[in-house]
A protein has these predicted regions:
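Short low-complexity, flexible loop/linker segments enriched in glycine and/or proline
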Residues: 1, 110-112, 214, 313-314
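Short, structured active-site "lid" loops
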Residues: 1-14
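Positively charged, Gly/Ser-enriched RNA/tRNA-binding surfaces
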Residues: 8, 17-32, 39-91, 138-315
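A conserved hydrophobic position in a structured secondary element of the catalytic/binding core
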Residues: 14, 99, 251
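Short, conserved phosphate-binding/catalytic loop or strand-edge motifs used
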Residues: 58-62, 98-106
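A short amphipathic beta-strand at an alpha->beta junction
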Residues: 94-96
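Short terminal or interdomain "cap/linker" segment that borders an active site or interface and mediates
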Residues: 101, 105-136
Length: 315
């Protein structure tokens, strides 16, 4: 992060992402608002990258956050929104990876590792630095079984078959539970028509330490950086005064300039789709049809609704 001092000696930081600022806004300005809350934003963010490494230190982030829901349907909604955000660019040469941070967390929860050791281990697994990972595991006070597990993690990526393979290495119920959650999401996404766009990475352990559940990334062929990233962060907003779950993602707009083929001549209509318990998948299907036609859609769970109903907002 870029840090400096103001004229009173206080430490100032240029924002490295927009998730934390939005968490602060939800915990203060929207502390009495009823969930779910939905935010969208476009803003510049700043991160320190290695010189001559081919990465920018300032770029434009565009993203969405879904606040207040913690069920599988909300994860599914944000995944569909992320996938559609890439599809609308009219360029099918993209890769979409899904993981679960709790797969790594469930493995290290019983180990006597410091926070620094956990972060270093996560970084080596996430970047698939195989030799460095092997050397670092020899420095840690962990059993041979754990060493074998962590050495295998960077290799557990690919199609849906990776989830079945991951189950073979799941040595406790929590690990199995996290894979089964990904399997459930995968089945729903396949039913919605996204099956051939998905890959999975059980060794995805991003550096931002606020994630608590699903995590995902999007890539385009010919673009050397991640263009989309996101996940669930249920504990972050509580640091700003409101205990409420959240999930979201952001897109690096600068990295898309070479792959965008977008028709902005159409003026979209806006719809709200209300759905009752058990109708989330049907509601997402209806939203997908409308979004594929260029419309803006907001999904709203409503307990007193039997089935689904949609309303077009007046312009």
């Amino acid at each position: 992060m870029y840090k400096f001092f103001d004229d009173k000696g206080r430490i100032m930081v240029l924002r490295p992402d927009m998730t934390i600022p939005i968490a602060r806004v939800v915990g203060t300005k929207f502390k009495d608002s009823n969930p779910p809350l939905r935010f969208r934003y476009t803003a510049n963010v700043f991160r320190v990258n290695e010189s001559l490494g081919g990465k920018k230190n300032e770029y434009t982030d565009c993203g969405v956050e879904l606040i207040g829901l913690t069920d599988e349907e909300s994860d599914l909604e944000i995944l569909v929104t992320a996938l559609d955000s890439l599809k609308v660019l009219k360029n099918n040469n993209f890769k979409f990876e899904i993981g679960n941070i709790n797969f790594f967390n469930a493995a290290v929860s019983d180990l006597d590792l410091s926070e620094e050791e956990r972060e270093k281990l996560a970084e080596l697994i996430d970047t698939k630095s195989l030799k460095s990972l092997e050397d670092y595991l020899e420095e840690l006070n962990v059993s041979e079984d754990y060493k074998a597990f962590f050495k295998k993690l960077p290799w557990l990526f690919g199609g849906e078959e990776v989830l079945a393979e991951g189950k073979k290495y799941a040595f406790n119920e929590e690990l199995k539970k996290n894979i089964e959650y990904l399997e459930s999401l995968a089945n729903s996404l396949k039913e919605l028509g996204y099956g051939d766009m998905l890959t999975f990475d059980l060794g995805m352990v991003p550096g931002l330490n606020y994630y608590t559940g699903i995590i995902f990334r999007g890539y385009f062929e010919g673009v050397g950086v991640t263009v989309l990233s996101g996940g669930r962060y249920d504990n972050l907003i509580s640091q700003f005064g409101r205990d409420i779950p959240a999930v979201g993602f952001s897109i690096k707009l600068d990295s898309l300039l070479g792959v965008i083929e977008y028709d902005d001549t159409k003026k979209p209509s806006k719809y709200k789709i209300y759905y009752g318990k058990g109708y989330a998948l049907e509601a997402i299907k209806k939203a997908k049809l409308l979004r594929d036609s260029g419309h803006v859609v907001e999904l709203i769970p409503k307990e007193d609704t039997d089935g689904i109903e949609s309303k077009e907002e007046l312009k």
